[in-house]
């Protein structure tokens, strides 16, 4: 930066008394135009090769990165598609399991209700049988008591009505009947 300032200060302080002016030199050989052109062409050729190879390498890297990205995108889309298929299958399996569970629960509930009804019917039958047995036993007890009371009553009436004469006749009658068997 300082050198640019020095150049400008030299040009500004240049003595104009010498009648020097800036002009275009038409002599190509003295002006080194050919050398400058050759230098520029050489630089362009070298830089073209250098920059061209760098740009080609860069372009190849970018294209390779794009291809890799596209390949990863294809793989990701493939995995996504496969995952969506698996999700759909899983949802179908879950729906089927839920349906089977509901069916099984309904069957179990119905089985429990049927078993409960059968148990109630058994209890009713057992209760009826128990009641019938109790009725028979009570009837037998009543009959025994009625019979016992009747025998006591008849015995009491007989004791009141049978005289010793009647008693002797009954005994003789029974002996006579037994005598025929002996």
Curated annotation (Swiss-Prot):
Q: Which PANTHER family match?
A: ATP SYNTHASE SUBUNIT B, CHLOROPLASTIC
Recorded GO MF terms = proton-transporting ATP synthase activity, rotational mechanism
Q: Tell where it localizes.
A: Plastid, Chloroplast thylakoid membrane
Task: State the InterPro entries in the record.
Answer: ATP_synth_b/b'su_bac/chlpt
Q: Which UniProt keywords apply?
A: ATP synthesis, CF(0), Chloroplast, Hydrogen ion transport, Ion transport, Membrane, Plastid, Thylakoid, Transmembrane, Transmembrane helix, Transport
Family the UniProt entry places it in: Belongs to the ATPase B chain family.
UniProt keyword Ion transport present: yes
What the protein does comes down to: F(1)F(0) ATP synthase produces ATP from ADP in the presence of a proton or sodium gradient. F-type ATPases consist of two structural domains, F(1) containing the extramembraneous catalytic core and F(0) containing the membrane proton channel, linked together by a central stalk and a peripheral stalk. During catalysis, ATP synthesis in the catalytic domain of F(1) is coupled via a rotary mechanism of the central stalk subunits to proton translocation.
Name by which UniProt lists this protein: ATP synthase subunit b, chloroplastic
Species: Gracilaria tenuistipitata var. liui
- An example Gene Ontology cellular component term from the record? proton-transporting ATP synthase complex
Q: Which residues cross the membrane?
A: 36-56
């Amino acid at each position: 930066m300082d050198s640019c300032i020095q150049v400008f200060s030299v040009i500004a302080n240049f003595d104009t008394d010498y009648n020097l002016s800036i002009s275009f030199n038409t002599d190509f050989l003295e002006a080194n135009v050919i050398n400058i052109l050759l230098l520029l062409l050489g630089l362009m050729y070298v830089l073209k090769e250098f920059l061209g190879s760098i740009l080609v390498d860069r372009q190849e890297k970018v294209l390779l990165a794009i291809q890799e990205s596209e390949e990863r995108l294809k793989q990701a889309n493939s995995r996504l598609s496969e995952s969506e298929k698996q999700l759909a299958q899983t949802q179908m399996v879950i729906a089927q399991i839920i349906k089977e569970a509901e069916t099984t629960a309904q069957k179990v509930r119905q089985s429990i209700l049927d078993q409960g009804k059968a148990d109630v019917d058994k209890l009713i039958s057992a209760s009826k049988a128990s009641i019938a047995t109790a009725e028979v036993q009570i009837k037998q007890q009543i009959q025994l008591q009625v019979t016992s009371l009747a025998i006591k009553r008849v015995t009491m009436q007989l004791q009141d009505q049978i005289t010793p004469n009647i008693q002797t006749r009954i005994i003789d009658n029974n002996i006579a009947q037994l005598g025929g068997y002996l």
